């Protein structure tokens, strides 16, 4: 069924003035969009006309509504969070105001509540007339923001990114400030292929009446179209895999070339508080135009914003840095601290509610216990002076980490030129505490040779072989990434050690918490350390000389945890769409609903009728 997924594109075109009242008109065009980042609208698109001066026209609202998918639960509220209303008139006025500014490299210039990088003014193109917006097309509805393509009368195209209202206003503002500064750093300092930013707004107090990033439009196909991770071994497969892995590995290598003076995230000089403005982000800058351009401020890594809507910003600010480069312990502990504060805040709200669900209280109480364990073990996880870890000092130096390095975020502008996009949540941290890009990362059992590592592989049934094939392909792809890392940064290859992966697992699992029961994976990764603790102490891998494991587990507790973890894994595997949080692509949702597989409940949610699934099995083409 996934083969039927298509993204919908809407286009808002500015037409000539009408003869009645001189009002600007627009056409709202809905068309199917697949694969390309710059496909033309379909000729069969539906068109709805609206007056640009009529900001309350209900037909216009469709242009801002979320249409990419639906959720099994709380669908209306989740779609409401993803509405991206902005002022079309304000956008036109704002762009023309930018055109009147002088092009100059300096700190972002304040303009009508937003900020302009005037050194990138050339993105507007040139015209003797007033710069106006000719058309606006919705080209992508992502996980965290919506993307519109803006076409100007100069012939130039821009991208307008509007973030969803998934986090607090303060979190959205911090993430936008840091992402724009990170993009600017990658472009000006490292000379990397990233879209230049023209302007950004961190709240709704600007002419667009929405937070936004306005940046360069890059045409081309996504590198993901070339990514086929489960193909059998062959020279052609090896070549194809390297066509995707190599440019991303090279991009990472250039990012790793700079070591910073603190842990945190990048911002422009004027976007951090005064006490942080005196500290340069890195040593040795010889370009006077860059020496005071960026600073390191609080981390915008996702654990400080994800599911933290109930937590006061003042509490978050106590734990999100920045941290001195010598204080890795504080960085490690911050994850446990913020999750502890979040869980305790939720528990307080439950205790104050007489009608609260008792199961929720039990769940959060267990979360608190796990995060207390994480806080206890975090300072001891990895010895930053260990003689057993090759180049340990290099591994702990502050370096820029981009969490979404992925072929989905790489545009092939030409056959030999790739552009990288999406730098939300980028942070500066020790390389040893980062994880591999998700498209190559594999945490399952490793199989390096099917016939040698899997007894009786040749005699197995085809279905059983496929399970081992999958494990082998995932191992192969991760191994290819590690070989590229070793090729470019042999001094950092110690991160490939299985022991290092085990030691940092509690920290990484905590960073990846998405829902309430994910704490079980954090606890499981802590428990896993217990069996090897004495050996890790003896080899000075951990930051402790005590061979006694720092956390005392009873046999009863371990049995209960193992059972709960197994139940959760079974629940995840057996529950339809659990991996996507109950989200279903819209065309698939409509099909399943029409077939009676999805049935609406009294409270407006949807449930899956398993009997109907058996009556409507996917066709062979859909299974592929």
Curated annotation (Swiss-Prot):
Keywords: Mitochondrion, Transit peptide. Its main location: mitochondrion. Residues 1-34 form a transit peptide. InterPro entries: Aminoglycoside_PTrfase, Kinase-like_dom_sf, Mito_inheritance_9. It comes from the Eukaryota. Signal peptide: none annotated. It is found in: Mitochondrion. PANTHER family: ALTERED INHERITANCE OF MITOCHONDRIA PROTEIN 9, MITOCHONDRIAL. This is Altered inheritance of mitochondria protein 9, mitochondrial. It comes from Candida dubliniensis (strain CD36 / ATCC MYA-646 / CBS 7987 / NCPF 3949 / NRRL Y-17841). The gene is AIM9.
């Amino acid at each position: 069924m996934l083969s039927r997924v298509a993204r919908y594109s809407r286009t808002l075109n500015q037409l000539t003035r009408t003869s009645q009242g001189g009002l600007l008109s627009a056409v709202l065009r809905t068309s199917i969009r697949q694969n390309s980042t710059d496909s033309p609208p379909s000729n069969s698109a539906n068109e709805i006309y609206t007056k640009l001066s009529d900001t309350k026209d209900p037909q216009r609202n469709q242009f801002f509504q979320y249409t990419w998918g639906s959720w099994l639960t709380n669908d209306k509220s989740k779609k409401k969070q993803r509405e991206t209303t902005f002022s079309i008139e304000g956008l036109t006025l704002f762009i023309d105001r930018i055109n009147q500014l002088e092009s100059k490299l300096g700190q972002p210039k304040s303009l009508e509540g937003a900020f302009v990088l005037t050194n990138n003014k050339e993105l507007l193109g040139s015209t003797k007339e007033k710069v106006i917006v000719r058309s606006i097309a919705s080209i992508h509805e992502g996980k965290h923001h919506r993307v519109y393509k803006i076409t100007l009368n100069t012939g130039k195209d821009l991208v307008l990114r509007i973030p969803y209202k998934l986090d607090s206003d303060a979190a959205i503002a911090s993430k936008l400030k840091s992402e724009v500064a990170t993009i600017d750093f990658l472009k000006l300092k490292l000379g990397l292929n990233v879209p230049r930013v023209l302007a950004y707004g961190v709240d709704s107090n600007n002419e667009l009446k929405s937070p936004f990033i306005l940046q360069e439009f890059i045409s081309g196909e996504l590198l993901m179209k070339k990514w086929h991770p489960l193909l059998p071994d062959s020279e052609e497969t090896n070549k194809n895999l390297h066509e995707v892995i190599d440019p991303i590995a090279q991009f990472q290598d250039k990012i790793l070339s700079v070591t910073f003076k603190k842990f945190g995230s990048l911002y422009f000089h004027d976007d951090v508080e005064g006490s942080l403005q005196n500290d340069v982000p890195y040593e040795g800058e010889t370009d006077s135009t860059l020496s005071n351009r960026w600073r390191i401020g609080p981390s915008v890594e996702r654990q400080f914003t994800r599911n933290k809507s109930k937590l006061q910003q003042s509490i978050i600010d106590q734990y999100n840095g920045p941290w001195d480069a010598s204080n890795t312990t504080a960085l490690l502990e911050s994850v446990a601290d913020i999750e502890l504060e979040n869980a305790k805040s939720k528990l307080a709200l439950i205790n104050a509610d007489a009608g609260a669900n008792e199961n929720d209280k039990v769940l959060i109480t267990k979360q608190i216990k796990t995060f207390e364990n994480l806080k206890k073990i975090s300072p001891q996880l990895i010895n930053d002076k260990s003689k057993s870890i090759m180049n340990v000092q290099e591994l702990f130096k502050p370096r820029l980490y981009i969490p979404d390095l992925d072929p989905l975020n790489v545009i092939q502008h030409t056959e030999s030129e790739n552009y990288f996009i999406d730098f939300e949540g980028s942070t500066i941290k020790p390389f040893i505490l980062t994880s591999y890009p998700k498209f190559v990362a594999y945490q399952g059992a490793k199989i390096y040779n099917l016939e040698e590592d899997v007894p009786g592989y040749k005699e197995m049934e085809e279905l059983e072989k496929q399970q081992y094939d999958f494990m082998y392909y995932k191992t192969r792809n991760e191994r290819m990434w590690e070989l590229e890392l070793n090729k470019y940064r042999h001094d950092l290859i110690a991160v490939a050690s299985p022991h290092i992966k085990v030691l940092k697992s509690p920290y990484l699992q905590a960073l990846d918490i998405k829902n309430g029961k994910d704490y079980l994976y954090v606890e499981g990764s802590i428990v896993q350390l217990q069996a090897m603790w004495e050996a890790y102490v003896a080899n000075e891998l951990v930051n402790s000389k005590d061979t006694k494991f720092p956390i005392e587990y009873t046999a009863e507790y371990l049995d209960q945890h193992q059972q709960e973890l197994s139940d959760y894994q079974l629940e995840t595997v057996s529950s339809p769409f659990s991996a996507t949080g109950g989200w279903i692509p819209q065309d698939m949702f409509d099909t399943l609903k029409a077939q009676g597989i999805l049935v609406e409940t009294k409270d407006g949610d949807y449930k899956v009728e398993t009997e109907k699934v058996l009556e409507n099995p996917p066709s062979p083409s859909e299974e592929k």
